[in-house]
């Protein structure tokens, strides 16, 4: 076996290759892209919004049972991109942690603390031979009393960062390029602008116009900081506004 080939170093999650790579963690990132979904998050001046594709793989499936948007608490939402089964496991643990936090301290778990907890959990999965990383990138969103709207992204390696706008999944880089142009002037988006920027970014990278039933939109607003998913009718209104504007 040649030292630089990488062969043998992808068997165990805890062993670095001679080039300093952890192959199993890299494969987890590939699993996120292989799911074929793209998600986008945008932070406005008084709201935060995430948009993700809703692909129903089987015509016999009940559409309402397919989702990548998960409420963690009443005030925090999470959009999971990647392997859905891994996402549900992560969501359940995050809900338990948030409930425990509220019971212990008497107030809701802040968005940044939850994002850090998810990242810490993911990081531990990269250290032990008997575990595997989760094939999920999670975007966590909410409105903080002190810091306003917050959007965090947590990945399988255990990174977590706050973002003005971000993307995950198959067309991540294209979406980031689009968002960088949109956010260059550091705009203060209203609620409608925030939602429509996120939706139009997804339209741009997928190069297609989609129906309201083919995407999911999750929002949190400062005036009413509860996480909720927009209805099909509300999404339709935003799609109409985008097409009229363009």
Swiss-Prot record:
SMART domains: Proteasome_A_N. InterPro entries: Ntn_hydrolases_N, Proteasome_alpha, Proteasome_alpha-type, Proteasome_asu_N, Proteasome_sua/b, Proteasome_subunit_alpha6. The keyword Cytoplasm applies. Disulfide bonds: none annotated. Its main location: cytoplasm. GO terms for biological process: response to zinc ion; ubiquitin-dependent protein catabolic process. It holds the Pfam family Proteasome_A_N. The proteasome is a multicatalytic proteinase complex which is characterized by its ability to cleave peptides with Arg, Phe, Tyr, Leu, and Glu adjacent to the leaving group at neutral or slightly basic pH. The proteasome has an ATP-dependent proteolytic activity. Belongs to the peptidase T1A family. This is Proteasome subunit alpha type-6-A. It comes from Arabidopsis thaliana.
